[in-house]
Amino acid sequence: RVLFRSTDDVDDYGLPPHSIEAVVYGGLDSDIAQIIYKELGAGIQTTGQKVVEVITASGATKAIHFNRPHPVPVYVKVVGLSTSGDFPHDGVDQLRAAIVAYIGDNESGGVSIGETLYHQRLPAVLYKVPGVLDFDVLIGTDAENLQADNIPVDSRSKVVTDDGMVTIDA
């Protein structure tokens, strides 16, 4: 996700005039900095907490700034799972893997930076596992306060989960 400011004043997010802020999920810092440098227009500054030095075409070094998204942990609980005979022996593991793949973990994939996690989209993910008939799914950023509700995030954040944050009560 790239936030940019083309005017002469600071915006509501604190972006300085004539600057970009790349919020990047995944990848190596050095690769990210090289890509930003290659695509950066003249006179545009970069902002962010990560700073990587790149070598310019003239042999000079230039500091490239960018940010990683703020991780928003998501806990998921599937309750009342009802299945048919088509449900595979490793179906619970498949459900857990499907949830992690859809939301994304700390390394890759899932819902985009700045995108709300919509509760109503999760059932479609779970019904892809053969033999799933019915269930309820609850989500939240606190394991003790799960709800059937959306999880909004700001433009510099990303929802993440992992196997240990997904509970399936069959």
Residue ranges and their predicted role:
Residues 1-115, 169-170:
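Carbohydrate-recognition loop of C-type lectin domains
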Residues 67, 87-170:
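An aromatic-glycine-centered, glycine-rich loop/turn in mixed alpha/beta architecture
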